[in-house]
C-alpha cells in the first residue's frame, strides 16, 4: 500500500491520472493484509477500497479476480473521459448496459466480485498456489520464489541448462508438458518478451501487433546474432491455477 500511496502522490503532483490494472486486485489486497504492517485486522474488501481511492480509474479483466470466464470493464472518475469512452463503446461493443456481454456473464461477474474478496476464498487460493510451489521445491524443480497468488513460475533456463537460450528452453518445456501430460501453460521468456518484434528467430515469429511479410526471412538466411539482445530475458514457464477447479490430488 505504501508503494501505491507514493506513486499516487507523485502522479497527482504532476497532474497525471493514475490507472490501475485491477485484474488481481483481491489477491493484492490479501498480500497487503498478511504482509504489510497495520492491515492485519482489516478486510480484503476494505483494503481494496483504499487501493482504488488512490487512483483515477482502472482496467479490469474479470477472467481473473472477477471469477468469470469472460468480460471485464473500464472504470474512470472523470465524467468527460467516461463520455468519450461510452461513445467508443457504442460503435465497438454495444450499449453501456451490457458492453457486448450476455446477461449470464454480467451476473457471474457481479457474484464473482463479491466472492473474490472473501477471506476464506483468498486464503484457499493463495494457499493452493503455495502448495504447488512447495511440491516443486520438494522435488528440486527450480521456481520463482516466493510464489504469488495465481501461478507458479518454473525457471526453465535453470531446469534445462542443456538447451541454449536461443533455442527457447521455456517454450520447449511447455511443449513437453503438453505432449506428455496434456498440461497447458505459458512461456514467459524470449519468445513472449523478445524485442525483435515482427522478426523470425530460428523459425519462430516473435510477438508483435505489426507484422509485415518483409520482416520474415528464409530459415537459411537467419542472422545468428538477431536474437542476441533478447537472450538476457529469464526463461520462465507459467502454470496459472484455475480457480475452484483442482484439488491437491490433481497437483500431486
Regions found by a protein language model. Give the residues of each.
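Conserved PLP-enzyme active-site core in the AAT-like
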Residues: 1-141, 154, 164
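Conserved C-terminal alpha-helix-loop-beta "cap" of PLP-dependent enzymes
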Residues: 94, 130-252
Amino acid at each position: 500500500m505504501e508503494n501505491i500511496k507514493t506513486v499516487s502522490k507523485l502522479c497527482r503532483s504532476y497532474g497525471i491520472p493514475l490507472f490501475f490494472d485491477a485484474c488481481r486486485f483481491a489477491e493484492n489486497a490479501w498480500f497487503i493484509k498478511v504482509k504489510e504492517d497495520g492491515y492485519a485486522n482489516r478486510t480484503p474488501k476494505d483494503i481494496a477500497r483504499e487501493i482504488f481511492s488512490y487512483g483515477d480509474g482502472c482496467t479490469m479483466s474479470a477472467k481473473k479476480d472477477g471469477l468469470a470466464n469472460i468480460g471485464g470493464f473500464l472504470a474512470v472518475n472523470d465524467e468527460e473521459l467516461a463520455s468519450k469512452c461510452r461513445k467508443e463503446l457504442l460503435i465497438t461493443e454495444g450499449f453501456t448496459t451490457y458492453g457486448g456481454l450476455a446477461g449470464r456473464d454480467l451476473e457471474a461477474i457481479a457474484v464473482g466480485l463479491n466472492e473474490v474478496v472473501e477471506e476464506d476464498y483468498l486464503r484457499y487460493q493463495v494457499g493452493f498456489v503455495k502448495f504447488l510451489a512447495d511440491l516443486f521445491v520438494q522435488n528440486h524443480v527450480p521456481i520463482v520464489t516466493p510464489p504469488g497468488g495465481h501461478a507458479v513460475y518454473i525457471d526453465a533456463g535453470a531446469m534445462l541448462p542443456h538447451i541454449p537460450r536461443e533455442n527457447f528452453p521455456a517454450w520447449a518445456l511447455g511443449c513437453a508438458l503438453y505432449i506428455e501430460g496434456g498440461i497447458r501453460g505459458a512461456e514467459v521468456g524470449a519468445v513472449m518478451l523478445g524485442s525483435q518484434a515482427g522478426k523470425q528467430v530460428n523459425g519462430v515469429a516473435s510477438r508483435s501487433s505489426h507484422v509485415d511479410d518483409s520482416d520474415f526471412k528464409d530459415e537459411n538466411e537467419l542472422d545468428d546474432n538477431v536474437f542476441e539482445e533478447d537472450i538476457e530475458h529469464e526463461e520462465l514457464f507459467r502454470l496459472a491455477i484455475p480457480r475452484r477447479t483442482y484439488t491437491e490430488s490433481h497437483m500431486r
